Amino acid sequence: MAKRALGLGQKNKEKKRKVDNSNSNNEPNRNSPAPGADQIQVEMDENADLDDELTQLKGLWNNYFHSDRESEYVLNGIIHECDRLLRQSDSDEKTKKLLNDEFYAIYALALSELTIFKTEQEGEDVSQYFDQALEWAEIGMEKTSKDSQLLQLAVSKIILQRIPLQFISKLTVDSKPEDVNLDLFEQLQRAKKCFNVEKDLELAYEVLQMFDDLLDMLENFGHGNNIDEGLDSDEEDEIEPVKLNKKHPLYRLQKAIPENYAWLKETMVKLFENIEETTLRRNVARTLGHLFLKAAEEPTSVFMQQYDDEDEEEETEDKEVPKEIKQAQKEALSHTRTALDYLEKAQVEDEPETWVEVAEAYIDLGNLHDYQSSEQEKAYKVAEDILKKANRASHGRFQDILDNLLAKDQD
């Protein structure tokens, strides 16, 4: 399986964010307009009301949300504009009516995003930004609707951004309960409870990606620089989770990893079923493919152990396969077939790497079938055909994978 791309939580730790020089060392003054805020370029929908201040704010947020998110300057501009509208609403009824759940969600999410930059500034306490972000989301629910799905989703995102940045990044395997001032397990439960997939599907997908990143961090907690650098899937198979003391702040979260992966898969499937937009649907399908391949790893390991045992012992003819091996094979095949279904839906016509992910899943499928069976040969042949096509389209970029498969066929 190809190397897993680092997600938001890990990118924040390993990637140096670019910070605008004019704002890098100074806390923004919320009682004055953002310096040069009127110079920020904002792309608006052609049907948008350009005189509507909330529409302008939404345009600014969407620009940031769909960018590479490397501008603290833009975030400060969003926060200053939110502050300005709040002050203006005290004396202007028209402005007051603009402050709906979208406004409060933008304010809360912008404050939460700001922590990405603040973690890089020595001595900066990000807890205040997360506290304010949650406070504005809660104020928004009080002012608009407690049932606002957007604000609930914002709360979920803020919590999932907070746990890694404020807490996990500072913890070690020897940390004590008093090292954190929140029950992180209960915080994650709250994030799950607040999550929903009916609206704001792009934001919902990002939240689930952050959930996935968090589980990955918990699995690899205590393995030092491996978390920062990212782990190849082959390396992940060899690394056992560090066993934490029962009083460790992450102990309950670590114990809940399997059930949380199950929740993630189930919830991601619901999200996929609600999406019609092509690009987002493909992205979610690709993530689901990887999640189901991951689910197949443990039963695959159990199934493949029989071949390792045969290398150590003399093979006996007609040796009966243990029941647990057969069950593991069945489970791994089920997960891998489901992964294949999603990865095929994630293919992009002019992106050969998406075809190769399908080919690699077919190789996994072949490995799970009985040795030299017709099912195994068929799976390998499909993988070979896809790899040859991808190799031609990419001028030999995937030759190594193809060579490895052909060598397997000759064994």
Curated annotation (Swiss-Prot):
Q: Which stretches does UniProt call biased (Low complexity)?
A: 21-35
> Is Transcription regulation among this UniProt entry's keywords?
yes
Q: Where in the cell is it found?
A: Nucleus
Q: What is this protein called?
A: Enhancer of translation termination 1
What PANTHER family is this protein classified in? Answer: ENHANCER OF TRANSLATION TERMINATION 1
One cellular component (GO) term of this entry: nucleus
Q: Which GO terms describe its biological process?
A: positive regulation of SREBP signaling pathway; regulation of translation
Q: Which UniProt keywords apply?
A: Nucleus, Transcription, Transcription regulation, Translation regulation
Entries under InterPro entries matching the protein: Nro1/ETT1
- What's the main place this protein lives? nucleus
Instruction: Supply the Pfam families for this chain.
Output: Nro1 (PF12753)
Role noted for this protein: Required for correct translation termination and probably involved in regulation of hypoxic gene expression.
Annotated region described as Disordered, given as residue ranges = 1-38
Species whose genome carries this gene: Zygosaccharomyces rouxii (strain ATCC 2623 / CBS 732 / NBRC 1130 / NCYC 568 / NRRL Y-229)
Q: Which family does it belong to?
A: Belongs to the ETT1 family.
Give TM segment ranges: none
